Structure formats: C-alpha cells, structure tokens
Amino acid sequence: MSGKTKRLMVMAGGTGGHVFPGLAVAHHLMAQGWQVRWLGTADRMEASLVPKNGIEIDFIEISGLRGKGLMAQLTAPVRIYRAVRQAKKIMRDYQPDVVLGMGGYVSGPGGLAAWLCGIPVVLHEQNGIAGLTNRWLARIAKKVLQAFPGAFPNADVVGNPVRTDVLALPLPAQRLVGREGPIRVLVIGGSQGARVLNQTMPQVAATLGEQITIWHQVGKGALPDVLQAYQQAGQGDKHQVVEFIDDMAAAYAWADVVVCRSGALTVSEVAAAGLPAIFVPFQHKDRQQYWNALPLEKAGAAKIIEQPQFTAQAVSNLLAEWDRPTLLAMAEQARLVAIPDATERVAAEVAAASK
C-alpha cells in the first residue's frame, strides 16, 4: 500500500457472533497492509481471543442494561458518559482512519466517540433484526451494512464473514452426489449446547433407527447426561456424541443435514457450507434467531421449528420425508442464498469510508 498506512479500529465484543466476523475482516485488511486495533471490554471473550490473533486491544468499561435493576438503570447515563470519554481518548491516541462496529455493548460508546472525533463509522449488523445499539448508531454512521435483508430498510446486504475453511468446502453437487447409507445428521447447539436438542435428538434416533446416523455436539458439561439418554433410547453405540467439535468444516463436510439453533453466524456458515437445516430459534423476545433463519426457509433450503413444537415426532417426520435428491436440492438452494465474499464486501466498504 503506498503512502500513509491506513488504520482501522474494530469495535466488537461479548460473543463469537460479533467477534469472529470482526476478526475475519481485520485479517483481510491486515493482509492488504492496514494497521488494526480493537476496542473491547476486559471481561468478555475478546480480551483473550483478539490478542491471540495478533491484534492489540484497548478496553473501555461498559456493560449491558437489559435485565439490570433500578440502580443500574439510574446510573447508566454516568457509566455511558465515562465509557465515551475513555473511548475518545483511545481514538485520539490511535487516530484511526475509520471505525468498524460489529456489535456488542462496546460499539455504542465507541461509535459515539468516533463520531465526536470526526472519524467515519461503518456499522455491520449480523442478525436479521437490528440490535438496540446498532439502531441508534445507524443515525450517525457513514455506512450501514446488514447480513440479512430486513434489519435496516436501506442498508446494503453483504452477508456475514465466515471462516475460510468453511468457504473452501466442495460445492453440494461435488460433496453429496453418490452418497449412500443412512442420512448423516449433524446436531449443533453452539459451544454452550442447547438443552432442547440434547433432550429430543436421542428420541429421534430411536424413532428412525438405521435410517439416520448422528454426530451430536452437546456443549460443555452435558456429555454424561446426553450419552445416558442415547443409551436409554437403545442407541448407545450407534452415534457420535461429543462435548465440542473442534473442526466445524470437517463436520459440515460429513453432514447431509444440520439440526441447530439459528444464531447469525451459524446460519451464515450453514448456507456457505451448502447444507439443508432444521433450525430451532432461541426463544428471544425480539425473535432475532427466527428472522436469521427465515431467508433459508423461504428459499426452500431449511425448515424452522419453533422450540415448543420441536418434538421427536416432528423432527422424525421431517427427516423421514427428506430423501437424498431432496437434500441435494435443498443444499444447492442454501448455497445460492449464501454470500461467500462477505468478508471482502465489508472490507471494501471500510476502505471506501476511510477516503
């Protein structure tokens, strides 16, 4: 890169759904010669994960207000003011050319501080319905991007940046044609697991018997109980049941169909991998995960089953209906919905906003 090295400040924290897409964009721009720093909080996952990725991180003191008591609500303006002051000092010291907000509590004070310092703000909303912080920041942002249509009325749809090993998987027609034997069902509840999946899928295994084979990620601490549930269902040694899957790309490559929650990053990875899915949205009051999954259901690539209706019989009926030609057609539709160059699209908008 000729001339002055461009500087980016990424604001993202709290959960992997915010941090991992931010890391993907950061690495892409670093490979082009950009200098990148991170704004986060010291008590969330970004504090350890970001430095492991070779990126320096600065911290401000901020936390969420949802579900907090009256005293926390009353002192919120003081805490937000203090966090904005902290963020302004960091911005003035680092002097970024542009700031990228990927979500989490840190984005609010960070985005406001950048705006007050005259630094352009680019926002990326990962979910199908915008969070409170991004709805507010959208008023002062130079550019607003969204992963799924509908979060903002006029924002560009750019997808969610996903891991390169998932993007490198063979296309469904290369991967799935010629497969025989039981339908391969990958069950993912996220790294924390999902109790409804852990309770229901052993019964699905018992109902469908040799029609399916399951690879089930149960989440931290749930392995003994889920193994016992498979044992009691007469399915003890017939399926692969693990606490955590380290290589998700390998799991996607193995699978014919996925049963999972519909967090933003999960939905984007399933689409990029080209896999049919049964999505079970987390019962959040704004139905965020339902809106994430809806584009894939509308495309004929997935089925949404709300948690109260997620029974062994309902899941068994669906899986029994889906033969291999149907699954291949759904997989190809999933891949059509995917935006495989999301990282490049977000990075290009960041670069454009910095000029």
From Swiss-Prot:
It catalyses: di-trans,octa-cis-undecaprenyl diphospho-N-acetyl-alpha-D-muramoyl-L-alanyl-D-glutamyl-meso-2,6-diaminopimeloyl-D-alanyl-D-alanine + UDP-N-acetyl-alpha-D-glucosamine = di-trans,octa-cis-undecaprenyl diphospho-[N-acetyl-alpha-D-glucosaminyl-(1->4)]-N-acetyl-alpha-D-muramoyl-L-alanyl-D-glutamyl-meso-2,6-diaminopimeloyl-D-alanyl-D-alanine + UDP + H(+). It is found in: Cell inner membrane. SUPFAM superfamilies: UDP-Glycosyltransferase/glycogen phosphorylase. GO terms for cellular component: plasma membrane. GO terms for molecular function: UDP-N-acetyl-D-glucosamine:N-acetylmuramoyl-L-alanyl-D-glutamyl-meso-2,6-diaminopimelyl-D-alanyl-D-alanine-diphosphoundecaprenol 4-beta-N-acetylglucosaminlytransferase activity; undecaprenyldiphospho-muramoylpentapeptide beta-N-acetylglucosaminyltransferase activity. Keywords: Cell cycle, Cell division, Cell inner membrane, Cell membrane, Cell shape, Cell wall biogenesis/degradation, Glycosyltransferase, Membrane, Peptidoglycan synthesis, Transferase. Pfam families: Glyco_tran_28_C, Glyco_transf_28. It is an enzyme of class 2 (transferase). GO terms for biological process: carbohydrate metabolic process; cell division; cell wall organization; lipid glycosylation; peptidoglycan biosynthetic process; regulation of cell shape. UDP-N-acetyl-alpha-D-glucosamine binds at T15, G16, G17, N127, R163, S191, I245, A264, L265, T266, V267, S268, E269, Q289. Pathway: Cell wall biogenesis; peptidoglycan biosynthesis. It comes from the Bacteria. InterPro entries: GlcNAc_MurG, Glyco_trans_28_C, GlycoTrans_28_N. Its EC number is 2.4.1.227. It is a peripheral membrane protein. HAMAP family: MurG. Belongs to the glycosyltransferase 28 family. MurG subfamily. PANTHER family: GLYCOSYLTRANSFERASE (PTHR21015:SF22), UDP-N-ACETYLGLUCOSAMINE--N-ACETYLMURAMYL-(PENTAPEPTIDE) PYROPHOSPHORYL-UNDECAPRENOL N-ACETYLGLUCOSAMINE TRANSFERASE 1 (PTHR21015). Cell wall formation. Catalyzes the transfer of a GlcNAc subunit on undecaprenyl-pyrophosphoryl-MurNAc-pentapeptide (lipid intermediate I) to form undecaprenyl-pyrophosphoryl-MurNAc-(pentapeptide)GlcNAc (lipid intermediate II). This is UDP-N-acetylglucosamine--N-acetylmuramyl-(pentapeptide) pyrophosphoryl-undecaprenol N-acetylglucosamine transferase. It comes from Yersinia enterocolitica serotype O:8 / biotype 1B (strain NCTC 13174 / 8081).
